[in-house]
Amino acid sequence: MARFTSIVLVLSACFVSSRAQFGFFDQMFGNQGHQQHQEPQNVRSDSSWYQAQYEGAQCTHYLCPGTLSCVHFPHHCPCAWESVEDKAELGDGIAICGSKGGWKEGEFAKKVELARKGVL
């Protein structure tokens, strides 16, 4: 009887240790086969979300299409990524945004002006 108990203990110890090892491998290799976790969904590819945001925005002046900011004039629209973009006004009531690219302050506007003159 003591021998039977020790055999049962050894087998259960082997089972527990193998279960722990396979749990480690499941976790290490993406838990394939046991539990399925849901991936976050991508943003929809149609324009309905943007249109709903645009139509729901409250603005009594001009609503910037790129940032949904409410400003007095179209050329006052901010850049969408102000930390990495500079804005240059073209003088026709139009403003464009472009990458700062590591240039000095105002360098983007100078490059746009040179390109408009055909120098760059």
UniProtKB/Swiss-Prot annotation:
Residues 1-20 form the signal peptide. InterPro entries: LCL2. The keyword NAD does not apply. Keywords: Signal. Probable component of the endoplasmic reticulum-associated degradation (ERAD) pathway. Belongs to the LCL2 family. PANTHER family: LONG CHRONOLOGICAL LIFESPAN PROTEIN 2. This is Long chronological lifespan protein 2.
